Amino acid sequence: MKTTLVIMAAGIGSRFGGGIKQLAPVGLNGEIIMDYSIHDAIEAGFNKIVFIIRKDIKDAFKEVIGDRIEKICKDLDVEIAYAYQELSELPEGVELPEGRTKPWGTGQAVLACKEVLHEPFAVINADDYYGKEAFVKLHDFLVGYAPEKANQFCMAGFILKNTLSENGAVTRGICETNEEGYLTAVHETSNIVKTPEGAAVDNDGQLTSINAESYASMNMWGLTPEFMQTLEDGFKAFFANMGNKDILKAEYLLPIYIDELLQAGRVSVKVLDTNDKWFGVTYKEDKDYVVKSFARLIEAGVYQKNLFEDLK
């Protein structure tokens, strides 16, 4: 079965270079975090990759990342496709509000794939390292897809303590699950900091402890092809319900929309737990830690020095 990895990379800056965190080299041969996600997805069995970018960065993206990955994937019989998130791509009858410059969010980003997505798929952020286990579990879930399972989704559930930064506060989707391991709610929680006891929310210096063993969503979802129509319907409703005061800043966010569907009883989301440690460059100070972490993984034999060598 065809299974696709969708990489949300439209947030990459329009200038490529040392200042763009998504393109900061972290591997021994200049690999970026995205390289490791692509490697792990292919190793797990994904056989198609869709990059969501913006048209204004297409040439630079292909020069820095895309062409190199296309060559690797061609040799591995993995299909590559592009989708473009644009501010002006709106539902029929909706005009771009004057003065709007902010992108419409991750929901619109995934919706940009509508013409190239016809199979079960996983969605990830371009600049997060998720570890190998989550890709294997998502792939194994997605290959069980059938049309009668159109509303059965999954997500990778990371342990909160494995997703925190040593260098400052982070925002995470704290998850509630039932006894069967299905998601019941996602609470977007800001200002989470690492503490000697585990984790806490920092409210202007007032720390409130939270369970560091909670599941956290890192925007790694397993979804079905039918979801694309639901997502489009949701985007139309997003505009229909939006007040004028929100028109310049409101965002259509994937986890919030999935939670709306969940609360309405329209979908189920199986939480696939992973004990892998998440890495990301939330703060510039995180980069050294990420580089050292990949060096340790290579030393331990988790990855080859030449990253894609073991897939050939």
Which residues make up each language-model segment?
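Short beta-strand-to-loop acidic/aromatic patch adjacent to the donor-nucleotide binding site
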Residues: 119-129
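N-terminal glycine-rich phosphate-binding loop and ensuing alpha1 helix
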Residues: 2-70, 85, 119
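Conserved core of the sugar-phosphate nucleotidyltransferase
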Residues: 132-220, 225
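A short, conserved beta-strand element in the Rossmann-like catalytic core
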Residues: 13, 129-131
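A C-terminal functional module that forms or caps the active site or interfaces directly
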Residues: 232-267
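Short, surface-exposed amphipathic charged segments that create phosphate/polyanion-binding patches used
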Residues: 91-103, 168-173, 285-289
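Hydrophobic helical membrane-anchoring modules
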Residues: 263, 268, 278-280, 284-312
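Short phosphate-binding loop-to-helix
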Residues: 70-119
